[in-house]
Amino acid sequence: DVESRGLGDVYKRQGFASAIGFAYGERFQRGLLDPETPKEDSPFYHKIWAICGEGDIEEGISGEAASLAANQKLGNLTVIFDANRIQIEGDTNLVLAEDVLKRFQAYGWYTDEFSFIQPDGSYKEDIEGLADVIAKAEKAAPDQPKLIKVHSLIAWPTPGKTNDPSSHGSKLGAEAVAGLKKLLGYDPEESFHVDEEALAHARKVAERGLEAHKEWDEKFDAWRKANPDKAALYDRLKAGELPEGFDKALDDLEATFEVGKGVATRGASGSVLNAIAAVMPELWGGSADLGGSNKTDLKGAATFAPAECATKQWPNCNEFGRQLHFGVREFTMGTITNGILLGSHTRPFGGTFFMFSDYERSAVRLAALMEIPNLYIWSHDSVAVGEDGPTHQPVEHLASFRAIPQLEVIRPADAFETAEAYRYFFEKKNTLPGAMVLTRQGVPVLAETAAKAKDGVKKGAYVLVDTEGTPDVILMASGSEVQWAVAAAKTLAGEGVKARVVSVPSMEWFEEQDAEYKEAVLPAAVKARVSVEAGVAMPWYKYLGSYGKPVSIEQFGLQGDGAQNMIDLGITAEHVVEAAKASIAEVEAAK
């Protein structure tokens, strides 16, 4: 259960792949802390056990993730497939015709099966027999993930409900529960009774667990004594603290930024990742086959994969590498990195094009629901993508992801804001996921952000350019459009109009600020406002008010040069000036 807040259907479609993320996390964390010890002797080695049903097997993501698990030789993962042939709409023969075990064998999994349904048609939940099959699998396939198919009957032995589809998604009902109690020899009128034999068994299991825990503690204590440096790293990771040198790494990088130079924020992001990776050994990640485009490659890092996976492009593969490759599997990438976070003390990230974040969305939503600090890196964030056309040009995505509660959407204006966004995301000891939304095209490094980003970005929105006295209009913008707001403010100033520019890298971070700060940035008395963003304007109306004007894109993109697309769709300084004047005029007319 990787969600823990309610109905299984919420999470089961991702649980299979998340379990694979747990296995990734175990191996990488062991490589950080105890790489030389044979894995069976390491206190950081553990096995991952997952239970799934037909619904999980039917979901496409399970196949995607299973393929990766076999490629990674995740021998510490065992999945028990409860094959009761029932789902909400009835017998799975309607929809699940293939031989599942052969499919998983083709991926590279070890498979076996065991049946609680006896040859004579009787039913016996033979746990000892199942344990023997699992032990056999452990011995036969130490370097393969394992799928054990268990043939079972749903709701056995409940009278009238055994092997009935209604048992899958509905209550058994008082009559059926009473019948089950009677069948098992209990008083049908008595509730919440725990049999003494069951209680004694549970206590015996608890005692066994305590003994195993004691043995592990002894192994861990011996490791700690023998590895003081690694123990210090473990303590830091467990506490969620950043390493010494984190701030300096970012400060040194920012010192290389040249005001006025065009730098794509995806490129700045790649520089930041490499700078902080040098001092954060727990940081690892990659992309869904777009590493070179997303700038998510860690220079000089080994690839997380068995040595035999090495290629001409990626010759350095080992089981403890920190460069991840997911293939074209965005949803799987999101769920595996979720699982890594849940199962280890490491910090993963995953990148793709912003347009393809749609395929990852369900994993992102679940991370927000679980309050885990996954890091999603989404580049190529607007119609400026250009020639690939509207299929690759996100326009509604910023609005739709901002609508997810507890997801922090971050769209920096330039290299300085990008560096400061990463600084704050990690420094705030975040328990929420963050999405870095980044440009394909170069954007100028602004003198204004050089002076103000360090204090401003962490507030979510801040005054980038101001005027003396009360402004006539406030120009709000995010990402690559901040440059046009700054240019428009200069034009307006030349015409005697006082314009304030507010950079808004993260609406979520801005909403965390107190009322006094919000009022200082967006004073209620200034009703003339403009928002500038290369996407639908929906999220901006709460800041625009009654007289504000959005400069936005309310249609799908265009096939053509990216810069020309921006012009053709009205994302220009000239259009911002027009919108500012229109907003001011409406305010004046209303007086």
Regions inferred by a protein language model and the residue ranges of each:
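Thiamine diphosphate
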Residues: 4-5, 28-30, 37-45, 58, ...
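Non-catalytic terminal/interface segments that mediate subunit docking, oligomerization
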Residues: 218-373, 430, 452-463, 469-471, ...
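A short, small-residue-rich loop immediately preceding and capping a beta-strand
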Residues: 8, 36, 44-59, 77-78, ...
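Short glycine/serine/threonine-rich phosphate/pyrophosphate-binding segments
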Residues: 15-19, 58-64, 331-335, 358-361, ...
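Flexible, small-/acidic-enriched active-site or ligand-binding loops
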Residues: 392-395
